Amino acid sequence: MNSPQETPTLACADAWFATNVQRCPRSAEWKHGARAGCFKAHGLAFERSPWPSGTAQDDARNAGFQYGYEQAKHDLKAEGAL
């Protein structure tokens, strides 16, 4: 269960993901990573990669993670949240 302090942040992270990633034509693995990266940028715990290291799925997840983290962090800075 999320603490009361995390709830607004979780809602913000989910809203960012829904707006920027959810409907893009990327793989499920990439989207999984983008969501994890977004969570990290918002200061939340994120899920590790469930795929073995070096697989195409893990590579896609890592690329998504990088995008999600960098873009969400950029957007948070632009909004003055960081």
Question: Locations of the language-model features?
Answer:
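Intrinsic-disorder/low-complexity detector
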Residues: 1-82
